[in-house]
Amino acid sequence: MYVGKESIDRLRLDEAFAGKIAHLPIADCICVKCDERLLVVDDEETKCSRFGKEGDDVGKALMVINEKKREIVLLSIDNKLLKGIQGGIADCALFDDKQFRFVEFKTNAEGNAQKNFDKATSQLKNTIQVFRDRLQAVDVMFDDAVVLSCHIVLSHNFPRSMATTQNYQYEFATDTGGIMLSFDSETYWEKPER
């Protein structure tokens, strides 16, 4: 049994997302890789997140540095596991037996930066609550089972300031019980995001 399967079983994701809430079964929404460098993209054609491949725009991706080559599960959430969730939902999650990171892509966002930041943080908070509720229904305390964190992936030319991102990070942590929010387009997997 591989780490990804153990993580899915331990979190009881199949049970938590069985029935009417799920658009597709968990098994149809995951991909597992253990490469040293993993690119995660939100596919513009399928409108679903996936691991990247040659030719994908690195400027619109999350690069995961996985030096220990741990198995990382990509769970495609928006338009795959869940569809039409009121309040919006994160694009995907990356996880293993220790960490669970929600990812929201805003790489095509234009115009009002505050509006885009507000929408992305709202979608992430809503996703956290959906997962907390679904997992609690199957007796899994999500926040105790894994280290939770979130990423908002923006295009490199999206306007933002250090003060703005820090304010959003502080507000997000306050609103979610301490969950870290990152705006970096590159992350190290071994370093817990808490």
Language-model features: locations:
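Short acidic, S/G/P-rich loop/turn micro-motifs used as interaction or catalytic elements
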Residues: 80-82, 108-112, 157-161
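Basic, amphipathic N-terminal segments that precede the first structured/catalytic domain
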Residues: 1-84
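Conserved catalytic cores of phosphodiester-cleaving nucleases, focusing on short active-site segments
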Residues: 92-94, 99-109
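Catalytic cores of nucleic-acid endonucleases
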Residues: 114-155
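Catalytic micro-motifs at enzyme active sites that drive phosphoryl/nucleotidyl and oxygen chemistry
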Residues: 79-84, 90-91, 136-140
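A short acidic/glycine-rich loop-to-helix N-cap element
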Residues: 113-118, 163, 167
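Domain-level recognition of nuclease-like catalytic cores that cleave nucleotide substrates
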Residues: 6-13, 17, 145-194
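Catalytic centers of nucleases
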Residues: 85-96, 120
